[in-house]
Every structure is written in structure tokens, then in C-alpha cells.
Amino acid sequence: MTEFDGCTNGATNMYLPGCAYYVSPSEFSTKTSFLSQGSSCPVTFPYSSNLPHVQPVREMAFREYGWRRSKWQYRGSYPSYYPSEEVVARDFIQPSNRRSDVLFKADPLCAHHGTPSAASNLYSTVGRNGVLPQEFDQFYEASQPTSVPPEHVGSLDKTGSKTQEVPPKITHSPDKKMGAEGRADSPSGEVAADKSNSSATPQRSRKKRCPYTKYQIRELEREFFFNVYINKEKRLQLSRMLNLTDRQVKIWFQNRRMKEKKLNRDRLQYFTGNPLF
């Protein structure tokens, strides 16, 4: 137990790892505490403290770190709000001695953005449209359409009502491309009735076609082969024999002559090869 012989004369106030008992602080009276030394690097806090033992906050001198003075500028204890004039003076107005260093240090004087209160100070008044400031009223007035006099408004209303009163064009339901073949197969009386109905009431659907029977077509074609133009007596005879009206027989012969004329023109064009002939 010789390693503990040197520790037998101490008191029991401080514990040492090498001894089984405590040592009095009088043994270390010559050593100063490390807490009594002052701070070699004072730190600045942005808030004020009410504790009596804390020293008052003092400004910390930054040596142009990052060449951005506005970024590292000390503002002391931040108040709850800033007056707009003070903010503009501090953020936008740089000291005169800093102007010469702009070219060398590239200080972003113009690129620095102020606080919303500064912006509200510059554009504190709102223009006509309620959004942009008064400086933009000249553009707002230029973009507004010129007011129309009441006389022109009345004339415009009259012309608009006239255009609305114009009825749409009547579109005829019969197909224009229907050749003489369809005309020959349809009764002459009903064709005329369809034309009159379509001109009078274009909204109504076309009446269903009632074609001639094969017997009627055969007898009419036979008569047309011998006589292209039929007289009134023969027309009345055919109408009684085929159970048709005199008008139906007359219109059928008209359509058949148009069909024959078209067929002759097509034959001539086919053999001559001249489309203008």
C-alpha cells in the first residue's frame, strides 16, 4: 500500500483518481481557475439581456468579410418594427466613402433588395386600377378603349338587330347530282310535289319516293323508243293504261329526254376525247 502513503496527509474535500480519499483545496491555492480568465474572442449577441452579470452588447468589427457590408452590417438589438424612413436610409443609401470601393470590391449596391417596408415607401400610393402605383396610370389610360358615343351605340344596336333578323339561306334537300335515271324511275307528279314542298317548307323532311313499277317503266320506255315527244292523246291513253295521271306521264317523258341527252353527250365525249366539245 505504498502508493497511497503520499496521500494520507490531505483533507477530504476533493476527490482524486489516484487516491482513496479527498484532498483539501488549500493544496491547490497557487493555481488559478480557468473560469476567471476573460474571453479572448468576444461574441456579439443580437439580443439584449436583463441579467446583471452579463456585460452590455458591443459592436463586433467585421473586416469586410465576403465584401458584402450590407449582409454583415450590425444592427444592434433588433426592435419590433422599423420606420420606413430609417429602413430606406440604412438599406438603400450607402455612405459616400463606400462609393469609391465599388469598382474594386464589387459591392452590390444596386442589387441589394430592401425590406417590404422600403418598397411600400417607394410606391406608397396606389393608382387607378388598385394594384399598380400612380406611375403606371399613363399606361393604364392608354390601354383603355375609347368610349363610343351614344349615337354610335344606337346605330350599332340597329345594325346588330338587322343582322339577327336576316333568315338563314334555304338549303334544298334534293340532291343535285341525281341524274336522269332517278328522274325517270320516279313518278312525275310526286317529283313536282317534292319541289313545291321543299321550296315552301324546307324544314320538313323529304317525302319518301314511290318508284314506278317494272311494268310501268317497260311500257313507258317502249313508247319513248318510238316517240320521243308524245302528244296529248297518247299521253292520256298511257295514263289510263298504266293507272297514272296525265302529269306523271308528261314529267316522266321530260326526265327521260334529259337523260337521253346526257347519255348522248357522254358517248360523244368518250369517243372524241374532247371534254369541251
From Swiss-Prot:
Residues 143-209 are annotated as: Disordered. Residues 172-184 have a biased composition (Basic and acidic residues). GO terms for cellular component: nucleoplasm. The keyword DNA-binding applies. Signal peptide: none annotated. The keyword Oxidoreductase does not apply. The lineage of its organism: Eukaryota, Metazoa, Chordata, Craniata, Vertebrata. This is Homeobox protein Hox-D11. Sequence-specific transcription factor which is part of a developmental regulatory system that provides cells with specific positional identities on the anterior-posterior axis. It comes from Notophthalmus viridescens. Its main location: nucleus. Belongs to the Abd-B homeobox family. It is found in: Nucleus. Residues 205-264 bind DNA. Keywords: Developmental protein, DNA-binding, Homeobox, Nucleus, Transcription, Transcription regulation. It comes from the Eukaryota. One of its GO terms (molecular function) is RNA polymerase II cis-regulatory region sequence-specific DNA binding. Pfam families: DUF3528, Homeodomain.
